[in-house]
Amino acid sequence: TDDLYNILRTRLFEEVGSEEDVLEIIEGYKDALNEARQMQYTNYTVDELSLGIKNAYPFHPSIRDLFARFKENPGFQQTRGYIRLTRLMVKDLYTEDENGIIKAKEKYLINAYDMDLNNGELATTVRGIKSSISNAIAHDIADNGSSIAEIIDKDTGKTDMQDISKLILVSSL
């Protein structure tokens, strides 16, 4: 709900972008959305996108739908679990990595795939939602550079395979 996103904004961020910042992000996403609509990848409208970003900012609006799918999971404590998971994601995004990069500085919106499953605390939280996926995470998504997605991404120099794999994972929780 919108109340949950207000709680997250208040508890997780000292400050969030201005209304002008949000409108600028919406404009950038509109172009990508229009291109996706032309290719018939989505039927999402510009109005739906605008409202979704305004309500969920600084999170991508799709995170609401994806996380809502697993809030009924017995291993997930609904609001408390949602706050814990997003807190860990945000903490990780704002922590400098081994290369001195703060990932949050490169993001316009926080997506469901913005979780480092090589981060022990974050991985433990995700595995706690559905423990049966532990082997799949290690084999397919994140195993300190040894998973299938990490190997493919190393070859391409991008994180696309891990991002897609994490979206599928979150959808299955």
Describe each region flagged by the PLM.
Residues 8, 67, 167-168:
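Short alpha-helical scaffolding segments that buttress acidic/His motifs in well-ordered protein cores
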Residues 2-13:
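Conserved AAA+ ATPase core "coupling" helix
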